Amino acid sequence: IRFNAKRPQKLALWPHYETYHATKDYADIARFIGLKGNTDEELAEAYAKKVIELAHECGVKLSLKDNGVTREEFDKAVDDLARLAYEDQCTTTNPVEPLVSQLKELLERCYDGTGVEEK
């Protein structure tokens, strides 16, 4: 949610959007479920936090580390995982076209659970 809610430098090729609207879409969802915010950006962040909160309430482990992946295993695989994610046909349907370096950064955050800590 957070990655796609930031205005991209380059839109994804598919589904050929002429304007970027992921932030507004997330804000609309946030409004629908009763979250508060003064801007679409604040509402998108409130929605991201709510999804994380719900995952914690359901007992979902939100990091690869907490799900048993060792740092050694992760470090060995992260470059290939980022490349494979970039090459996956579904990546082009993402609202934001990520760079391989951005995918690697997202994977690093997934390993550590950065940004999804329980409050």
Residue ranges of predicted features:
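Internal helical hairpin/lid segments
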Residues: I1-N38
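C-terminal charged capping/lid subdomain of soluble metabolic enzymes
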Residues: T23-K119
